[in-house]
């Protein structure tokens, strides 16, 4: 692993430090200020002639990002999480320690510098070193020195390198953290209670997806990593909670692309005595709050598309297929005509698909990618909405919506089905679909039906994909850019490096 000549050179330097009685992996030394706090506190020091007050000693820490050796002095750029700060180290101050520094210090090492503030001839605020310590000797050179890390695969597989050399990546994940905390705060302000439900389920449910399967040795039973928390959250509504939410991971054993990762984060929330129309209004308030919190304009650019949050619209499923997808009603309302139309358009569909699933295929191919501004699509076919409440006026549609922004689904919500007999029949239909080969059809969950039989109040529930939300609000083009450690195809790692020296 460490046979590379450049690594061997660095290992030799680490051992050389030990021979001098210095631990190349020290612990216990503390900084007094972050780099940003140092720059702010001593911003008034702008002139080389400022008194060099050694009583104003501060200790700063960070990774060496740039090293310029010049005979009896050197300039070092030290980066912590907050900022880059320049350190000036002179033989006049450190004597023999300066010789050790010149011999051992390299870009990538993590150091502590103790000294006083001063300005260089160019006016740059710096710390004039009185003490210098290597806290952690890095034995693998950083890639491409100060030019960044451009290999996309390497960036995802070795995210730590990506974070070291690409400051903008850190910014994305800091913004992700702000988005998640803002979403949590919004729902708390709206009166929702945050809860936690199981991650391992005896029966996978709450979504149409293929689960990951594991085995519980103590119980001697199979368990499934959850594909959605929905059925457990609705059990809580049965139990008397009236507004709950959960932000956590879901796992779906399916394909990966720029907007899908098998492990992803969602918020799901359930609101008793409300309808899906109330959720639409709540969603509008949520986005208003997020844009304000993130200091974003109502118009944002995503993937070269202008998304205008002031142009939010609501449209029914069939109207969207007709007016946006360009499919006439006489085709949409006849199953055989719709199947023929899809085949004529080159859409690959299975001949045994139900009418509702044919409509879904048409929507996916002809409508979804055109929904740029926030669009709430309502009145979904009941056949593709097994957990949603049946519409009172039209039993063939569900009181359901999905929110699309920039051509992607961002949220899914509906008035919940709380009729246990209807739910039991729909589960039976899903089981029949699974027996026909539909791996994503839902399982029978009699325990959940039994919970519903104890009475669930009229309730509305919704899920929002946090990763896609972060993509939208940060401009990231791939879900891998907003997940710190995304799923990757296994490769043999030979630990080759190209020296940045």
Curated annotation (Swiss-Prot):
Catalytic activity line of the entry: tRNA(Lys) + L-lysine + ATP = L-lysyl-tRNA(Lys) + AMP + diphosphate
Q: MF terms per GO, please?
A: ATP binding; lysine-tRNA ligase activity; magnesium ion binding; tRNA binding
Q: Which InterPro entries match?
A: Aa-tRNA-synt_II, aa-tRNA-synth_II, aa-tRNA-synth_II/BPL/LPL, Lys-tRNA-ligase_II, Lys-tRNA-ligase_II_N, Lys-tRNA-synth_II_C, NA-bd_OB-fold, NA-bd_OB_tRNA
Q: Which Pfam family is one of those matched by this entry? A: tRNA-synt_2
Chain positions recorded as Mg(2+) 1 binding sites: 402, 409
Q: Which GO terms describe its cellular component?
A: cytosol
Tagged with keyword Nucleus: no
- Principal localization reads cytoplasm
Its cofactor is: Mg(2+)
What is the UniProt remark on how the cofactor binds and its stoichiometry? Binds 3 Mg(2+) ions per subunit.
Give the record's keywords alphabetically: Aminoacyl-tRNA synthetase, ATP-binding, Cytoplasm, Ligase, Magnesium, Metal-binding, Nucleotide-binding, Protein biosynthesis
CDD domains given in the database record:
LysRS_core, LysRS_N
Q: Does the keyword Metal-binding apply?
A: yes
Q: What is its EC number?
A: 6.1.1.6
Family label: Belongs to the class-II aminoacyl-tRNA synthetase family.
Could you give the subunit structure recorded for this chain?
Answer: Homodimer.
Q: What is this protein called?
A: Lysine--tRNA ligase
Species annotation: Helicobacter pylori (strain P12)
């Amino acid at each position: 692993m460490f046979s590379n000549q450049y690594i061997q050179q660095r290992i030799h330097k680490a051992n050389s430090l030990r021979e001098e009685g210095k631990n190349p992996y020290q612990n216990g030394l503390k900084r007094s200020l972050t780099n940003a706090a140092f720059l702010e506190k001593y911003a008034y020091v702008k002139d080389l002639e400022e008194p060099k007050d050694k009583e104003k000693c501060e200790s700063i820490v960070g990774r060496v990002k740039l090293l310029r050796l010049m005979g009896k002095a050197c300039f070092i750029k030290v980066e912590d999480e907050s900022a880059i700060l320049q350190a000036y180290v002179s033989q006049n101050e450190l004597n023999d320690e300066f010789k050790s520094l010149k011999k051992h210090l390299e870009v990538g090492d993590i150091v502590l510098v103790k000294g006083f503030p001063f300005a260089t001839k160019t006016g740059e605020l710096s710390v004039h070193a009185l003490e210098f310590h290597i806290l952690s000797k890095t034995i693998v050179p950083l890639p491409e020195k100060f030019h960044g890390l451009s290999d996309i695969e390497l960036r995802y597989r070795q995210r730590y390198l990506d974070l070291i050399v690409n400051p903008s990546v850190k910014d994305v994940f800091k913004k992700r953290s702000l988005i998640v905390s803002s979403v949590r705060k919004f729902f708390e302000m709206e009166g929702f209670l945050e809860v936690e439900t199981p991650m391992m389920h005896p029966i996978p449910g709450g979504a149409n997806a293929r689960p990951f399967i594991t085995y519980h040795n103590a119980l001697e039973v199979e368990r499934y990593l959850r594909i959605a928390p929905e059925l457990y959250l609705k059990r809580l509504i049965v139990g008397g909670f009236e507004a709950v939410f959960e932000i956590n991971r879901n796992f779906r054993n399916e394909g990966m692309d720029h907007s899908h990762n098998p492990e992803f984060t969602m918020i799901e929330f359930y609101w008793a005595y409300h309808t899906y129309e109330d959720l639409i209004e709540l969603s509008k308030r949520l986005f208003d709050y997020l844009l304000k919190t993130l200091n974003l304009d109502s118009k944002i650019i995503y993937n070269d598309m202008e998304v205008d949050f002031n142009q939010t619209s609501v449209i029914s499923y069939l109207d969207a297929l007709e007016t946006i997808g360009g499919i006439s009603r006489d085709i949409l309302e006849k199953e055989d005509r719709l199947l023929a139309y899809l085949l004529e358009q080159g859409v690959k569909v299975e001949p045994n698909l139900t009418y509702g699933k044919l409509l879904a295929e048409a929507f996916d191919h002809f409508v979804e990618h055109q929904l740029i501004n926030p669009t709430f699509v309502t009145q979904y076919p009941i056949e593709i909405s097994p957990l949603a409440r049946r519409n009172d006026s039209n039993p063939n549609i569900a009181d359901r919506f999905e929110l699309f922004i920039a051509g992607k689904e961002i949220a899914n919500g509906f008035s919940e089905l709380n009729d246990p007999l209807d739910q039991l029949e729909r589960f039976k239909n899903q089981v029949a679909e699974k027996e026909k080969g539909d791996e994503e059809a839902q399982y029978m969950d009699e325990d959940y039906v039994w919970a519903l039989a104890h009475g669930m109040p009229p309730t509305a529930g919704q899920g929002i994909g946090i990763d896609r939300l972060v993509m939208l609000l940060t401009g990231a083009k791939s879900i891998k850019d907003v997940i710190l450690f995304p799923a990757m195809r296994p490769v043999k790692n030979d630990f080759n490096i190209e020296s940045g020296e």
